From Swiss-Prot:
GO molecular function, one term: actin monomer binding
Subcellular location: Cytoplasm, Cytoskeleton
Protein name in the entry: Profilin
Subunit architecture: Occurs in many kinds of cells as a complex with monomeric actin in a 1:1 ratio.
Similarity annotation: Belongs to the profilin family.
Pfam families referenced in this protein's UniProt entry, alphabetically: Profilin
One annotated Gene Ontology cellular component of this protein: cytoskeleton
UniProt xrefs under Gene3D superfamilies: Dynein light chain 2a, cytoplasmic
CDD domains, per database record: PROF
Length: 126
């Protein structure tokens, strides 16, 4: 499967994710959902935030021009929210899976779908 297939057939098809992208650690976009215009700068800062959560705590998580409030994170997962829209991101060996979900989808539902794909990508060396 291509990265675009993972976005379309794994993340969006689950109906637990409303927008998604997969990018390399360098911020280069590998695939994205239609209308999700996330920039290389936003992705680069997000990837940096996995190691340095302080930058996200102070300035939030910006995706497609929208600034989300950073909720929590580890070296593997980042969570943020703005109003009724949540963010769940997972870092793999070579990539980052970025997702947005909206009410009434629960955070755990989006997390499950994103992390299942992330774990699969890790098992494949990505």
């Amino acid at each position: 499967m291509s990265c675009q297939d993972y976005v379309d057939k794994q993340l969006l098809a689950s109906r637990c994710v409303t927008k998604a992208a997969i990018a390399g650690h360098d911020g280069n976009l590998w695939a994205k959902s239609e209308g999700f215009e996330v920039s290389k700068e936003e992705l680069t800062k997000l990837v940096q935030g996995f190691e340095e959560q302080d930058i996200l705590t102070s300035s939030g998580v910006t995706l497609a021009g929208n600034r989300y409030i950073y909720l929590s994170g580890t070296d593997r997962v980042i969570r943020a929210k703005l109003g009724k829209v949540g963010v769940h991101c997972m870092k793999t060996t070579q990539a980052v899976v970025v997702s947005l979900y909206e009410d009434p989808i629960q955070p755990q539902q989006a997390a499950s779908v994103v992390e299942k794909l992330g774990d699969y990508l890790v098992s494949c060396g990505y």
